[in-house]
A protein has these predicted regions:
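Glycine-rich, proline-tolerant flexible connector loops at the mouths of alpha/beta enzymes
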Residues: 1-17, 29, 147-150, 279-290
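Acidic (Asp/Glu)-rich catalytic clusters
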Residues: 11-22, 42-52, 133-137, 161-169, ...
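Flexible, glycine-rich active-site loops centered on histidine and acidic residues
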Residues: 31-102, 142, 148-154, 192-194, ...
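An alpha-helical appendage that flanks or caps ligand/catalytic pockets
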Residues: 76-110, 151-273, 302, 306-333
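N-terminal beta1-alpha1-beta2 module of alpha/beta enzyme domains
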Residues: 1-23, 118-120, 315-324, 328-333
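A conserved active-site cap/scaffold subdomain adjacent to cofactor or substrate pockets
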Residues: 128, 136-144, 148, 157
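Hydrophobic faces of well-ordered beta-strands that scaffold small-molecule active sites
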Residues: 23-26, 53-57, 122-125, 142-145, ...
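Conserved, mostly hydrophobic/aromatic
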Residues: 14, 45, 87, 122, ...
Length: 333
């Protein structure tokens, strides 16, 4: 059994240690938590970091974690939707009440009040088409983990945008999460990526048990049946695992600094993303190698992303508010 730490608690440390960098959660799994407590943690973190945090949510897909929290996995989808609605309601109103299937909340108010509008920076993980539809209808931005060919990801994003628009929301550009392996030579980058992304791929299956197909029978997770078939084929032979790892490496940001820039530009063109979450440490990659990976990217790739107009993107909405509004954040309800 393995349970995850509270994201806002960890980020409060970084909020106190930094002044300018953006912070973010990926992800808060809402079905595991009391939504009023989540809203309070978000509000306090918003105060501590000065409106610098982007909040990512998800519904989770690991049965071992649901068992640890003693929550039926079949309730994940309706619990997520109801909890998400409560969190938004709590942060966007001076006081609120709620009567639902899972939560009955008498009129209450969140203190401290957030100093910005964090609910306008809500994103949610969309690994499956079902999740993308839920997030679109809620009006959340989409946080997409790159596990498909980029044109397929673009199709999923277009579908999300269409559903969000139909639901009366203005869809935001997606945030893309990808692994990055940057090295001085393509050979070195690919060798490192193949080894450690392959191990990451295996660890994902070990944790989520995708290959055994159990999720296909869980209400709300039926679409994961296709994933089970894919993993079963991968695990059938060493050759299949090699091909699968090659494919996984091909859809990440892997190569020399120049290659990384070209791939990020293509990913931005294909998906319309305005923010990239780069994972530099994966699959047991030794800390020293992860640091070299990150520093090379920071030295050779990041400066170009920062100064080249082709990569320019707008700021996240509603980051800060006037100082006078800060004075009342701890006022009693």
């Amino acid at each position: 059994m393995r349970c995850r730490q509270r994201r806002a608690q960890l980020l409060s440390y970084f909020a106190g240690r930094t002044k300018r960098i953006s912070l973010g959660t990926a992800v808060i799994v809402l079905p595991w938590h009391d939504p009023v407590r989540v809203a309070e943690e978000i509000a306090l973190l918003d105060v501590l970091c000065g409106g610098r945090c982007v909040f990512g949510f998800g519904r989770g897909a690991a049965s071992v974690e649901y068992e640890g929290f003693r929550i039926p996995m079949e309730e994940a989808r309706p619990r997520f939707v109801e909890a998400a609605q409560i969190v938004v309601k709590a942060l966007s109103n001076d006081s609120f009440e709620h009567e639902g299937r899972f939560f009955q909340i008498p009129r209450t108010a969140i203190r401290p009040r957030p100093i910005s509008r964090p609910e306008r920076r809500f994103y949610a993980s969309a690994v499956s088409p079902d999740s993308a539809e839920i997030m679109a209808k809620l009006g959340f931005g989409i946080l997409m983990v790159m596990q498909n060919e980029w044109p397929k990801a673009a199709e999923d994003i277009a579908r999300y945008r269409a559903i969000a628009t139909e639901a009366g929301h203005s869809p935001r550009p997606p945030i893309i999460l990808t692994n990055v392996c940057c090295a001085e030579s393509r050979e070195e980058a690919h060798e490192r990526a193949f080894k450690y992304l392959g191990l990451k791929w295996q660890s994902i299956d070990t944790h989520y048990h995708f290959s055994d197909g159990h999720l296909a029978t869980v209400k709300g997770y039926e679409s994961y049946g296709k994933m089970a078939k894919t993993y079963a084929k991968i695990n059938a032979s060493a050759e299949a695992k090699t091909k699968a790892t090659d494919f996984y490496v091909s859809i990440q940001i892997v190569g020399t600094p120049s290659d990384c820039l070209d791939k990020i530009a293509e990913l931005q063109r294909c998906t319309g993303m305005d923010h990239l979450v780069a994972e530099f440490s994966f699959g047991g990659l030794p800390h020293e190698e992860a640091e070299v990976n990150m520093r090379l990217f920071a030295d050779k790739v990041l400066p170009v992303l920062q100064r080249d107009p082709a990569f320019a993107v707008p700021e996240m909405p509603e980051r800060t508010v006037a100082g006078t509004e800060r004075d009342n954040i701890f006022a009693p309800a």
